[in-house]
Structure formats: C-alpha cells, structure tokens
C-alpha cells in the first residue's frame, strides 16, 4: 500500500497482504479451497493464476494455465469464457473489500492474470455490486512491468 508516495508496511510488516483475507460471498462460489497457510478460502486461492487454473480444472477436468484459459476464451471456447466470467465476479468481490476499507485512487494488478485483456473492463463493471457506494471511482490498472512487477518491487525493497 502506497500513500503519498510512501510504502506503508505497518507494525507487523504485513500491510497489503490482502490475499490471506477470506474470500467474500460472490455468486457461484463453492467454498472449501485450502490455502498453503492452512486456512480455507483465502482470496489468493480464488483470484490468482493458480486459482483460475483450479476453477477451470474443476469444471472441465482439464489442467491448463491461466494464460491457456485466456487464449481459449479469446478463441471462443465457451467453458473458458464461463470460468473467466466467474473469475471476474470473484475478483470484483474481493477487490471491493479493499475499496470499501481504503477507497484508493488506483488498484494496480500484477502477475500473469494481469495480462488478460478483458479483465479490467469486466471487473470494473461488476464492482458496483460489492462496493458500498453509488459511484466507484477507483481505477484498476495493469502493473507497469507486468508479470515481473512483484519481483522488481521485492528487489527494490531489499535492504
């Protein structure tokens, strides 16, 4: 979390660890995914590349990466389209929790799923169902350095 150009770490150094909050209720979510942290249904078990891949595999019995699922969606494969629509709904619900608490100007998405072109419009369209406001002013943008943004950020923070 960055406020006025300064990284906010918090007293425990975990500020921004949004992925280990519980996934909120969204339509079609079938709870019960175990996270590596030992808890069930952490946000990152649903709205990450591996989470998207797990959702697709559960519904299609085929193991594909998030990129492969996105490519199938672009080519018109209906199962990929349905799974991505569910994913966008889940991501909107999860991001709404951040917006409801912080009301940030911008949310920056990184990692492989940030390359899914239709994600940004689809998620923004769905946010209104979950954000406690009549107007959602938060922008959702792709990280400037794409897939490598997390690694670059970690290297930048290294003492």
Regions found by a protein language model. Give the residues of each.
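Conserved catalytic-core motifs of eukaryotic protein kinase domains, centered on the activation segment
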Residues: 13-14, 120
